[in-house]
């Protein structure tokens, strides 16, 4: 039999969308595929730090996470690249000029930096665990790495 490659999303596919717990049918399917020698991986937009524990629960050792920027092969982190810095800064500056609240993940963790509290004022706190780091002297151009950008864009914009 030819080896096949299977990539699965997490929420609502491998785990219950409400609880985040792996569904029994997913665990059974993953095991069957792996036992037959197929390559099984997770493909998700989630950051790596939010994906690795779920992968471990599912017995999956390969991941494409962080929207394709992170690659984990046989439980080893191969790469986890930040966004293109110049494009990210252009987006951040445009959002800032328009008065939109901004949160920036500068590493692969629950930490986000912000220069003011506009994001929280405009849309409230994020629904997932987040540590907000308020730095009123934050100069976006001084940021070395940018992994994710969260922008509070009003519905009418």
Give the predicted meaning of each segment.
Residues 1-3, 37, 99, 144-146:
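A general structural motif
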Residues 2-19, 42, 91:
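Asp-based phosphoryl-transfer active-site loop
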Residues 7-9, 70-72, 140-142:
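Short, basic/glycine-rich phosphate-binding loops at helix/coil junctions
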Residues 17-20, 40-41, 80-81, 128:
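Short, flexible loop segments at the rims of nucleotide/cofactor-binding pockets, characterized by
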Residues 23-24:
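A positional/architectural concept
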Residues 27-121:
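Active-site phosphate-binding/coordination module
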Residues 94, 100, 105-157:
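Conserved acidic, metal-coordinating active-site core of Asp-based
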């Amino acid at each position: 039999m030819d080896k096949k490659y299977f990539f699965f999303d997490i929420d609502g596919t491998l785990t219950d969308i409400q609880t985040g717990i792996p569904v029994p049918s997913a665990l059974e399917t993953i095991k069957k595929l792996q036992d037959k020698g197929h390559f099984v991986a997770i493909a998700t937009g989630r950051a790596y730090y939010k994906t690795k524990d779920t992968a471990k629960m599912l017995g999956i050792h390969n991941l494409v996470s962080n929207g394709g920027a992170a690659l984990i092969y046989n439980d080893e982190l191969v790469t986890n690249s930040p966004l293109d810095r110049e494009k990210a800064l252009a987006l951040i500056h445009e959002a800032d000029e328009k008065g939109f609240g901004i949160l920036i993940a500068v590493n692969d963790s629950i930490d986000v930096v912000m220069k003011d509290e506009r994001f929280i004022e405009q849309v409230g706190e994020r629904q997932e665990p987040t540590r907000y780091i308020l730095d009123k002297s934050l100069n976006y151009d001084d940021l070395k790495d940018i992994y994710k950008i969260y922008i509070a864009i009003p519905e009418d914009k």
